Structure formats: structure tokens, C-alpha cells
């Protein structure tokens, strides 16, 4: 346990820093308008109504581009429900914006620790990675899928590196 203490302190610092950054928004229950998220909800409305009427999930919508598969807009498969719990655990069940920033810091921290970087430098690297401007541009635009994909790149590389060592 004593060996893990510095890593646990770094993770706790990531949580506190994420909460501190979004503190005004969390306290006042503000919601950031994200155009692509709103547009995606509108695009999926037809399929949502179909599900409410029939109880069946449609895999196609006519509301975009004369027809489009739903897996690109709002995928919902029974097989992914078990993975949602794993994702929430990785996010420490934190609120939306807080968990996004936390995921970036934690993922890059894991990568740097796998490569043998000391805790304090890995923590600093995670913070620098997370607070680069592009990620906040993605959040404000509503490009959450792209954001989450980029958040999972560093721990994925770390997993690959660990599997070959």
C-alpha cells in the first residue's frame, strides 16, 4: 500500500483539479451548450420515437442525408451495457465535464508511469495533456466521441507497451 500511495495521491489530485476547474458550472448546475450534441439528439429523435412506439430499436434513420445508419449517430446495443459500467468505474462515477478532464489526466498518467516516468513528472504530464486547448474546444463543440477516443489513446498505448514487456 505504501508503494501505491504516491499514485493514489496523484489520482486524487486529478479529481480535485477537475472539480476545481468546473466548480462554478457544477455548483450552479450550468450546462454548456454543445451544438453537435444538440444536433445529434435531434437526429436521433425519429429513432427514439420509434422505440417508444414499438419497443424495437431501429438501426436506420431517414432524418439525415436521406438515410443513415444509427450506429454513427447514437449506437445502442445490448452488448455494450456491461461496458458502460466499466467506463463509469474508470471515470470514478464523476459528473460529466469533470470526468472528461479526469479521464485525460489519468490516461496520460498511466502511459507515463508505464514508461517509467516518476510520479511527479507523470502527474505534471497528465495535467499538461488534459489542459491543452484542443480538448476544451472539443468539449464546447460537443465532439464528445472524438474526445473520449483521444482520452483512451494513451492508456491503450500503455496497455500495448505492457503486453510486450
Regions found by a protein language model. Give the residues of each.
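Alpha-helical transmembrane segments of integral membrane proteins
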Residues: 5-13, 120-124, 149
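Membrane-interface coil-to-helix junctions
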Residues: 17-111, 115, 127-154
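Start-transfer (signal-anchor) and selected internal transmembrane alpha helices
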Residues: 1-23
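Conserved small/polar residues in nucleotide/adenosyl-binding loops
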Residues: 164-165
